[in-house]
Amino acid sequence: MIDTTLPLTDIHRHLDGNIRPQTILELGRQYNISLPAQSLETLIPHVQVIANEPDLVSFLTKLDWGVKVLASLDACRRVAFENIEDAARNGLHYVELRFSPGYMAMAHQLPVAGVVEAVIDGVREGCRTFGVQAKLIGIMSRTFGEAACQQELEAFLAHRDQITALDLAGDELGFPGSLFLSHFNRARDAGWHITVHAGEAAGPESIWQAIRELGAERIGHGVKAIEDRALMDFLAEQQIGIESCLTSNIQTSTVAELAAHPLKTFLEHGIRASINTDDPGVQGVDIIHEYTVAAPAAGLSREQIRQAQINGLEMAFLNAEEKRALREKVAAK
């Protein structure tokens, strides 16, 4: 179901949600961190979703063990490098990795700006080694409040040329986007693109707010847009993309089953929607699974899956020349 003549992208992929279970085990041993299990087989149920979680916040706790072993900036650099290696193994030509440095720094009080620098270094080295093209999206973790997000923003601004976009993720219901207007004003002043997690836990009003007040060019998840016809019209007309994450939305109980996922409806409505993983390490899936298993189960036809693949590049935070070069590179293979 993947068109090998087109670039394969993953533009909604959390770096800190893709820490290998084996790496968690190794870093735990290296830094003498007590883990809930001592073998890979027994650790996996603690760090991967085995059964669907009741809600988004419960799902997010599965990420915690991955960041608890980030006891040094070298560990952060390692997982960034491995994220690029994983992208290469998955056959991705282009990936946008998003990460929350405050979340990654929290367990061991690492310097937030140092985490940003370590991630940049690890990704740069990975791209050089594996030939994958990547850009970084900075996440502000709304769950930790406005001041913590301000600290993350300052760390990103210190490396503004290596950051492509700003995102807001975490507890959408408890910390609405309206709390972060000044943060996004500064992001736009820095010349960054804007993508926002919205319409995952909260309703369509959260998506409207992300677009109108935060300046979102893309929406992460956005499943609740299905409840507002005017919003779907607006998304299609303005070419505001929806970064769909099929398996993730089932695992967080945002959508009851794949057959009920709105991605097919979004594509039929002319919305620029793409297929992405979200937190592949925690979910136990990869982009190939999303295209070949999840998308057909969500009712997408072969042509709709191809359109979603095209949309992934069209939505990417690349300029027209970068997109053209990537298309030509893949077509020439």
Swiss-Prot record:
It catalyses: adenosine + H2O + H(+) = inosine + NH4(+); 2'-deoxyadenosine + H2O + H(+) = 2'-deoxyinosine + NH4(+). Binds 1 zinc ion per subunit. InterPro entries: A/AMP_deam_AS, A_deaminase, A_deaminase_dom, Ado/ade_deaminase, Metal_Hydrolase. Substrate binds at residues 14, 16, 170, 279. One of its GO terms (biological process) is nucleotide metabolic process. One of its GO terms (cellular component) is cytosol. Keywords: Hydrolase, Metal-binding, Nucleotide metabolism, Zinc. GO terms for molecular function: 2'-deoxyadenosine deaminase activity; adenosine deaminase activity; zinc ion binding. The record marks 221 as: Important for catalytic activity. Its EC number is 3.5.4.4. PROSITE patterns: A_DEAMINASE. The active site is at 200 (proton donor). Zn(2+) binds at residues 12, 14, 197, 278. It comes from the Bacteria. Pfam families: A_deaminase. Its cofactor is Zn(2+). The keyword Metal-binding applies. HAMAP family: A_deaminase. Belongs to the metallo-dependent hydrolases superfamily. Adenosine and AMP deaminases family. Adenosine deaminase subfamily. NCBIfam families: aden_deam, PRK09358.1-1. Catalyzes the hydrolytic deamination of adenosine and 2-deoxyadenosine. This is Adenosine deaminase. The gene is add.
